[in-house]
Amino acid sequence: MPAKEVAVCSNSFNGTIGETIIFKNNHSSAVDITQNGTATWPFATPPATPSPCVPAKSGNTEGTLSVTLLSTPGTYTYNTVGCPQIADVNPKTVIIS
């Protein structure tokens, strides 16, 4: 089964435990994914430190970053830095079931 693709600047998404997600960035600036304060980091990989980065779009090619969701169901939050102002709403939410 191919990995689910999610726009890195979207406000929320649903996933399943241990699922691989491909964050896609179609903007001209890179987007960092950061921990929401002391909230549980929703990704098994990569770690929260250093903050993972989804590269900027290059030509017609979107930047991508592969992440793996935790194996514990729940609602988790994280932040992004670098999304266009209209999409730069934090925290973002992922519901893992």
PLM feature segments, named:
Residues 1-21:
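N-terminal edge beta-strand
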Residues 4-6, 46, 51, 86:
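N-terminal targeting/disorder module
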Residues 19, 29-33:
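Short beta-strand/loop motifs in extracellular/secreted proteins, especially
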Residues 24-27:
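Asparagine-centered strand-capping/turn motif at beta-strand->loop junctions
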Residues 29, 47, 82-84:
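A generic structural signal for solvent-exposed, polar alpha-helical segments
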Residues 38-60:
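Low-complexity "stalk/linker" and mucin-like segments enriched in Ser/Thr/Pro/Ala/Gly
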Residues 52-97:
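Extracellular/periplasmic metallocenter environments
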